[in-house]
Amino acid sequence: MRTLPTLFAFTFALTLCASAQAPATDSSAPPAAPPRAARPVIATGPIVATVVPPALAGPVTYTCGAAKKGATTLTPATLISGTFAGWDLKTVPTIANGICSATGSDKPFFFSIPVPPGNYRVTLALGGKEASTITVRAEARRLILENLAIKSGASVTKTFDINVRIPEFTKPDGTQGRVRLKQREIGNLDWDAKLTLEFNGTNPAFRTLTIEPLVGAKSEPTLYLAGDSTMVDQDVEPWASWGQQLPRFFLPGIVVANHAESGESAISFLGEQRFAEIISIIKPGDYFFVQFAHNDQKVANGMPRYIQIMTDFVTQVRAKGATPIIVTAQNRDSFDADGHINDTLAGYPQASRQIATDTNTGLIDLNAMSKTMFEAMGKDGANHAFMKFKAGSYPGVERDIADSTHFNNFGAYELAQCITHGIRADKLPIEKFLDPAVRDFDPAKPDVFADFHLPYTPPQKQEDTTQIPQADLK
């Protein structure tokens, strides 16, 4: 799904926000540091400025095959090119009878619209000649619509909101700032000045697509996410994070902007100008979820600096009129002999709780909820939530994976549901944006893995199927 050098395609899809499993004999000790070669690499060489497309003057509508007044007609020849929207990532659907579809194929198709950074509303008329079960993702696999069942010949209209970002931003003094991207982020769909939609599932199909910039009077709140690889938009299967599943649980009216990145600590998130970009654009009425711990615990004597930076994040966000919310870090897949989760995070979740108390900030205790959930799953059941795969399970997975920190789609989805439960349980102000049709999740009663399904996003090029060094997963 991304255009990355072969060396980084899968190695940095993981990027090890923390090593897999700390020794159960010393639950307070941080896990061993990953091999030096597996650590995140900041991109070097000449910095190429992002080419920003012209702003949309208003709503733009695309229709499949059938001409419609005021709309752009899509054909198989409508390919993404420069500032022109079109089919992307070497996929082209079948277009017939006013419907764009992948009938009879298990492969998704992608459509991209070059746009400047900002928030956008997307409206889709979904459904085709055949009965469909459609999943829609945006950008780097952000889950938007999940297994939407549509009858044969029927059409269902769905609306959702998407954030688009680029590395460049304007500082408060008017000078130009730029996020220091890691090598794995170069070419990533989350940084490329276009809005990309993935149509997946069984017989995915749509009839019309409308995109509208949410500016001026139509501007709406944004939920900014700051964190590490357990929150990032993981762009390559089978990795996933709770941050990229979260948009599925919100109604139109709020946009999730996931600035989390693999390998980040509070210190590096600050130093790489990631927080600077957020604080340059966050506005009154916005929200800010922050979760760090897995990498911070690797910093020698890092706790005082962690507390200082996290407190400063809260102070700066609040000064801009936005609402900060602290999220404690989820546990690893580390059980003791009695079936209880080991504490492998060296006191950082408790530090997060104390910061929330000291600053009178909302708290989502994902650490506590994940402990309850993983223990309810049991050791064998919890394996289904983490990156535990046999060789050959996915393209490029040439060796067994035994990663006890990072999640697959199922684990990430369950954790995202824990987040929504935490919002509701503490009646946080962002609760009003949750989809009321989504049940209130109970961490003590997690979903059954065998009943869970999200369609697989295939790699777009050979570089996404490189061998994963086993040393990176221990």
What are these regions (language model features)?
Residues 1-5:
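Positively charged n-region of N-terminal signal peptides that target proteins for export
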Residues 6-16:
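Bacterial N-terminal signal peptides
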Residues 22-237, 397:
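Compositionally biased, intrinsically disordered or flexible polar/acidic segments
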Residues 87, 239-252:
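Short catalytic helix/loop segments, enriched in acidic residues and glycine
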Residues 139, 273-436, 440, 444, ...:
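Alpha-helical cap/lid subdomain in secreted, periplasmic
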Residues 252-265:
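A short beta-strand-loop structural module common to alpha/beta enzyme folds
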Residues 265-274:
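Structural motif
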